[in-house]
């Protein structure tokens, strides 16, 4: 077993060796290096064929038509293109958008930008387990609502939203539904022939593909229109200009192909490992599970250890690559906005750790993690005056702390 142990698969994944090998064939003079938009020679035709194959592989995993797949630079761009693109195109119908407080920043900050441009956004607060109350969503829908954006799987706590029902609600009212599926693709079955989802964002690097490549699904029937955000040569049916990075697209295609083949057995294996991890630490005193094991994806376990500072715990666990919150916000010392939206107090939110498991996680690593966490929590609490007061029965919520 090699240290440190990587348990931050929700931040990014290593490229699968099979994917890397495939990508290498599309870089040098010996390989297929042409521009897929070059229509006048074989170098371009071969590159275009490789892109077509990858587009089919991506579409296959999610039950889409390959013509509904638009390649982008990643899920952040896909979220921007979907939300700004749809809002700009349909703004004559209305200027109201609904999303939730626990979305990824790529959705929240895009909505904030639209607010500056005159759109109105309703931010729904989830229930304490992270799931959106569909009655609240329904109550928020108005005649001028043009877009709902609610993610499939939350990147911090792993809870799964009921996107099928939300899709039905939106379709019945003629509202466009966008889903950020960054954390669910390759982990949960997605069938867009059945789901009434109009726009869906994906990435490559969360499922063992390369970074810097993603896709946006844009439904053809009924046809969804979006306004391009990147202008130029009119690539990707005019929705996203820019020379296609063939090696990255091929990598993403191969990653999606592998996911389709291995997803069912791999998720079963990871569910076992996640449960093993939780069973190994759940009897620690004052430990709280954030999210919902029943309605959660098997790759994420988010736990708060009361009376332990999250940052000091991460330092104590230096042999484990884990995070508190998401990578995108891990540079700030603010407690996780996702956990606070669940109604959690700052102290508990601050003491949270996200363990995310993946393809190369082993049972041995999980057992080592359990042992290390138990030891570290014990040691840090021994040093904590708050823990001592708690053990003596002091109600810490009643204490007036002096400001200095």
UniProtKB/Swiss-Prot annotation:
Residues noted as binding pyridoxal 5'-phosphate in the record, renumbered to the chain: 75-76, 155, 183, 203-205, 243
Q: Show the PROSITE patterns listed in the entry.
A: AA_TRANSFER_CLASS_5
Q: Does the keyword Acetylation apply?
A: no
GO terms (BP aspect): [2Fe-2S] cluster assembly
This enzyme's EC code(s): 2.8.1.7
One Gene Ontology molecular-function label: cysteine desulfurase activity
A Gene Ontology CC term for this entry?
L-cysteine desulfurase complex
Q: Which cofactor does it need?
A: pyridoxal 5'-phosphate
Catalytic machinery residues: 328 (cysteine persulfide intermediate)
User: InterPro entries per the record?
Assistant: Aminotrans_V_dom, Aminotrans_V_PyrdxlP_BS, Cys_deSase_IscS, Cysteine_dSase, PyrdxlP-dep_Trfase, PyrdxlP-dep_Trfase_major, PyrdxlP-dep_Trfase_small
Q: State its location(s).
A: Cytoplasm
In this UniProt entry, the residues modified to N6-(pyridoxal phosphate)lysine are: 206
Q: Which residues bind [2Fe-2S] cluster?
A: 328
In which broad location class does this protein mainly occur, judging by the first location in its UniProt entry? cytoplasm
UniProt key word RNA-binding: no
Write out the catalysed reaction: (sulfur carrier)-H + L-cysteine = (sulfur carrier)-SH + L-alanine
Q: Which Pfam families match?
A: Aminotran_5
UniProt keywords (A-Z) are:
2Fe-2S, Cytoplasm, Iron, Iron-sulfur, Metal-binding, Pyridoxal phosphate, Transferase
Tell me the route in metabolism or biology where this protein functions: Cofactor biosynthesis; iron-sulfur cluster biosynthesis
- Membership in a protein family: Belongs to the class-V pyridoxal-phosphate-dependent aminotransferase family. NifS/IscS subfamily.
What function does this protein fulfil?
Master enzyme that delivers sulfur to a number of partners involved in Fe-S cluster assembly, tRNA modification or cofactor biosynthesis. Catalyzes the removal of elemental sulfur atoms from cysteine to produce alanine. Functions as a sulfur delivery protein for Fe-S cluster synthesis onto IscU, an Fe-S scaffold assembly protein, as well as other S acceptor proteins.
Q: How does it assemble?
A: Homodimer. Forms a heterotetramer with IscU, interacts with other sulfur acceptors.
Q: What is the name attached to this protein's record?
A: Cysteine desulfurase IscS
């Amino acid at each position: 077993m090699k240290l440190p142990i990587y348990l931050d698969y929700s931040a990014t994944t290593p490229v699968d060796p099979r994917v890397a090998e495939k990508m290498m064939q599309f870089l040098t003079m010996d390989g297929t290096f042409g521009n897929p938009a070059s229509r006048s020679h074989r170098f371009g035709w071969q590159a275009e064929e490789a892109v077509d194959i990858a587009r089919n592989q991506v579409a296959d995993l999610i039950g889409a038509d390959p013509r509904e797949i638009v390649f982008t630079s990643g899920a952040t761009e896909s979220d921007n293109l979907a939300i700004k693109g749809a809002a700009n195109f349909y703004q004559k119908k209305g200027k109201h958008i609904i999303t939730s407080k626990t979305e990824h920043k790529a959705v929240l900050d895009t909505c904030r930008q639209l607010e500056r441009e005159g759109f109105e956004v309703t931010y729904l607060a989830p229930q304490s387990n992270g799931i959106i109350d569909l009655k609240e969503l329904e109550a928020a829908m108005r005649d001028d609502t043009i877009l709902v954006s609610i993610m499939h799987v939350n990147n911090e706590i792993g809870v799964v939203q009921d996107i099928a029902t939300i899709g039905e609600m939106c379709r019945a009212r003629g509202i466009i539904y966008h889903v950020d599926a960054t954390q669910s693709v390759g982990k949960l079955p997605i069938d867009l022939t059945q789901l009434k989802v109009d726009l869906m964002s994906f990435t490559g690097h969360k499922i063992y593909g390369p970074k810097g490549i993603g896709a946006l699904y844009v439904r053809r029937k009924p046809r969804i229109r979006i306004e391009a955000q990147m202008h130029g040569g009119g690539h990707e049916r005019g929705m996203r200009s820019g020379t296609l990075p063939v090696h990255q697209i091929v990598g993403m295609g191969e990653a999606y192909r592998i996911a389709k083949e291995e997803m069912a057995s791999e998720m079963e294996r990871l569910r076992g490992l996640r449960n093993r991890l939780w069973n190994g630490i759940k009897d620690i005193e004052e430990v709280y599970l954030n999210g919902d094991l029943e309605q959660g994806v098997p790759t994420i376990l988010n736990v708060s250890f009361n009376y332990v500072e999250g940052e000091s715990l991460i330092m104590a666990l230096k042999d484990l690559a884990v995070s508190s919150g998401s990578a995108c916000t891990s540079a700030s010392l603010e407690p996780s906005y996702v956990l606070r939206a669940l109604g959690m107090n700052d102290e508990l939110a601050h003491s949270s750790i996200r363990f995310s498991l993946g393809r190369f996680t082993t049972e041995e690593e999980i057992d080592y993690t359990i042992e290390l966490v138990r030891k570290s929590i014990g040691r840090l609490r021994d040093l904590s005056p708050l823990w001592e007061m708690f053990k003596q029965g002091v109600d810490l919520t009643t204490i007036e702390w002096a400001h200095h």
